Amino acid sequence: MNGAIITDNERINIEPKDVMVKGSNKKQGVNAQTSTQRRPEHQGMAKVIINPGTPDFNRFLTARNGAVIRGFDDVSIAISSLFKTVDAVKHPDLVQAIQDWFNELHEENNKMKENLVAYIKSIEFDKNDSFMSSTQFVPFSFEPVQLNFNNHNTMRFYKYIFEMNQLMNTMYEYNSLGLLAVSDYPVMSHNIIKSINLYVENVKKTLNVSRRKDGPYSPAEFITKVMQYKSVQAYIAAEMSGKRR
């Protein structure tokens, strides 16, 4: 598929406003919601509602009794704890070193999204064709998934998930209409889900989330290592290169 991937701007017009970020509108101590998704620890956090658009993405998000969502939560907590622990006033260079690494992760995801958008734009069909103009695609309807966050880096990751879900939906529709090569949709669906899993794996391993003992996550070891090596990348190269992809 030439490494490319997804979009018809009329069908998928992704703008920042498309990310349905909602802040809590209830007063402190007032239980204004009875939803089981609303837990006390979500107070003071933003949330985004993702409506899975394809069976593949729905299976991914709901697999293993919610293990994927729990992994997202682990990453969100670790990122939030990390940036709350590091004093940006006393250690601006350390904060920047950590952010530089996150920027690299986000850039990798952005490249995949851009390739997908370019691929979708390249898909052409005759809008004057009477058969094509008579066809309609009936979208799937799955239970929505709520993701909670309170850090810029987690927001960027969840925005990527939100947008890739939309792009996969467009790919599925085009595939249903017979507009894609036979292997394009399954290959790209696999690659998108893999990219999301890879981000989670990289963050959990590098921030030592996967190796934490029972109890709340502490970023102390990671911070010590970054201060020692002066960058996250140098720390990974020196001590973790054999443990990663």
Give residue spans per PLM region.
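Polar/charged low-complexity regulatory segments
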Residues: M1-Y160, Q166, E173, H190-R245
